[in-house]
Amino acid sequence: MDVNPTLLFLKVPAQNAISTTFPYTGDPPYSHGTGTGYTMDTVNRTHQYSEKGKWTTNTETGAPQLNPIDGPLPEDNEPSGYAQTDCVLEAMAFLEESHPGIFENSCLETIEVVQQTRVDKLTQGRQTYDWTLNRNQPAATALANTIEVFRSNGLTANESGRLIDFLKDVMESMDKEEIEITTHFQRKRRVRDNMTKKMVTQRTIGKKKQRVNKRSYLIRALTLNTMTKDAERGKLKRRAIATPGMQIRGFVYFVETLARSICEKLEQSGLPVGGNEKKAKLANVVRKMMTNSQDTELSFTITGDNTKWNENQNPRMFLAMITYITKNQPEWFRNILSIAPIMFSNKMARLGKGYMFESKRMKLRTQIPAEMLASIDLKYFNESTRKKIEKIRPLLIDGTASLSPGMMMGMFNMLSTVLGVSILNLGQKKYTKTTYWWDGLQSSDDFALIVNAPNHEGIQAGVDRFYRTCKLVGINMSKKKSYINKTGTFEFTSFFYRYGFVANFSMELPSFGVSGINESADMSIGVTVIKNNMINNDLGPATAQMALQLFIKDYRYTYRCHRGDTQIQTRRSFELKKLWDQTQSKAGLLVSDGGPNLYNIRNLHIPEVCLKWELMDEDYQGRLCNPLNPFVSHKEIESVNNAVVMPAHGPAKSMEYDAVATTHSWIPKRNRSILNTSQRGILEDEQMYQKCCNLFEKFFPSSSYRRPVGISSMVEAMVSRARIDARIDFESGRIKKEEFSEIMKICSTIEELRRQK
């Protein structure tokens, strides 16, 4: 049946139809090839906005650096990064005046966190620049490699397991004249295969030691690797994002902890909360402004957009902010927090893989690595690339570009929010000392500004003053992209406000559908997404019911598990029909085994196995939930799992769903081809690391809450825990005497082996 789309809108208020204009159906665009060009764009753009600053040379690395701080005040509307130190400090002082004790309390909270955080905090997060191998790695591997190198260079403070001690090692590593690292390389040789008698290439992975001098080490420690941001909708051009290395990460974490603690106490901050909590917070600010604008006052709201937020932020400003926020705090604490901005003032951007060249005529392809861009003849490049390279050349050192001004994407979201809020805070009448006043919301680079005044001229004057105040701290409100409306209608972080927040349902569209993890998880995730959208996003009962039917249909086509009594022929239909015929209670079969769907919008919260358990044949129950079933490699299933769902904007969200372990919870095996590459050594390291961590979790399940504290190795901690548990179990009669003595014997053997090592 064809539906005339205009009919859909007859009964819908205009603001609810906003979601249909979003570019959120279909696949998002992904980037291909290298991000080198995008990174050069970022570096060049950042320098352009600060071009009237002062040039200096870093004495350690020889990198040229541009410092725009306290530079000339802009005379036009072009974006610029010339923040004025005294203005930033004053904004901080006024923020503290309006919120007495806010900085002090946040510092105390952060000091506590700093003293307690374990180094394994750094294993969170995805790709991390691994300076030992000069490329990206999973965070856990990159951390393990860093610690291994530190250890072999005599830096062992980190073995206490505290993050702060690891950071001491980082500081000491920067003073060393040289550092020895282990890198992976691969050898290829031609050998004759015994079976086929053909010649084959055999690859072996070697590890080799390499010495790095102080300058090279510093460059690596200060390097941010860059990648292209994928899956970004509604944009024509891609852009680069940065992944910092392990040396920077810990310091950034502490700064962001402090800033997060401050943001939590600021009513104008859209971070760190999200979802419904964020909506409630925002609605409060709007309510305050609307109730205060009595009948005599006008109230307008700007849906704001800042031009090139990251490129105009400056680490030197962040240093000034931190210095102010942490005044009167212990010296060690002030030092540890000031290191992140200092490192960012000296950061280097790695240009990525370089350029690919191909000659159609000679069928040749060759890669020009980023390291060669400094010296290669530019005649091979097209006009625009040539300009980029010419501009960036003076900044290049070893394939990285010196990038002192600017903050790469997503590094100091919380701290930059504090800066934004400090300007919103200046809108109170006691500061504007006139008839207009403002307030608003800030979340990283996104803002909404509410201005109240007795007449239109006052509104205009208020907006102008806000605009100019922002310029003083390096924030550039875009006059082209911001728009003003009567208060009551605006957009902030993709939430649409119209006398209350309107559900922007289209943003959730990408997360509907079959995830492709396995039959068990996919069913659970699918119904949970529908349930969550009924709770949070105005998904009505009729639409939800339809979404559910579409999901089941999609699910059956994905796993070829149509009902046992259907006429549809697939590869699985023969087996499923057989199962259907020999099952007495057909309602008990899971959908993935050709059973009927028993879900409706009232029971979405119940896992399918539980929903059908009473209806199942006994032998089916036995097969389905049998951990000894030889056809299933089981992962241990927690009662709640996390799935990654892709909402339409922002990062992938983690969503909890109920996981019931059945024979359908299989895990696909790793692709074999990786085992023949240079990644193999790394993969083995990673699996070892994983195994150790899993074992450790067994001894100290997160339910026991307290992490082992104190200076002991993982092995020692596990042995002592095993002894304590064994004694308790023995005394309470849960284990026999023989078992108890065997456990004690194993513990002693382990300790003996450690001593011999």
From Swiss-Prot:
Residues 55-64 have a biased composition (Polar residues). Residues 286-483 form the RdRp catalytic domain. A motif (Nuclear localization signal) lies at residues 187-195, 203-216. GO terms for biological process: DNA-templated transcription; symbiont-mediated suppression of host gene expression; symbiont-mediated suppression of host mRNA transcription via inhibition of RNA polymerase II activity; viral RNA genome replication; viral transcription. One of its GO terms (cellular component) is host cell cytoplasm. Residues 50-82 are annotated as: Disordered. Residues 249-256 are annotated as: Promoter-binding site. Gene3D superfamilies: 6.10.140.720. It is an enzyme of class 2 (transferase). One of its GO terms (molecular function) is RNA binding. Phosphorylated by host PRKCA. InterPro entries: RNA-dir_pol_NSvirus (IPR007099), RNA_pol_PB1_influenza (IPR001407). It catalyses: RNA(n) + a ribonucleoside 5'-triphosphate = RNA(n+1) + diphosphate. Its main location: host cell. Its EC number is 2.7.7.48. Keywords: Eukaryotic host gene expression shutoff by virus, Eukaryotic host transcription shutoff by virus, Host cytoplasm, Host gene expression shutoff by virus, Host nucleus, Host-virus interaction, Inhibition of host RNA polymerase II by virus, Nucleotide-binding, Nucleotidyltransferase, Phosphoprotein, RNA-directed RNA polymerase, Transferase, Viral RNA replication, Viral transcription. It is found in: Host nucleus; Host cytoplasm. Influenza RNA polymerase is composed of three subunits: PB1, PB2 and PA. Interacts (via N-terminus) with PA (via C-terminus). Interacts (via C-terminus) with PB2 (via N-terminus); this interaction is essential for transcription initiation. RNA-dependent RNA polymerase which is responsible for replication and transcription of virus RNA segments. The transcription of viral mRNAs occurs by a unique mechanism called cap-snatching. 5' methylated caps of cellular mRNAs are cleaved after 10-13 nucleotides by PA. In turn, these short capped RNAs are used as primers by PB1 for transcription of viral mRNAs. During virus replication, PB1 initiates RNA synthesis and copy vRNA into complementary RNA (cRNA) which in turn serves as a template for the production of more vRNAs. Belongs to the influenza viruses polymerase PB1 family. This is RNA-directed RNA polymerase catalytic subunit.
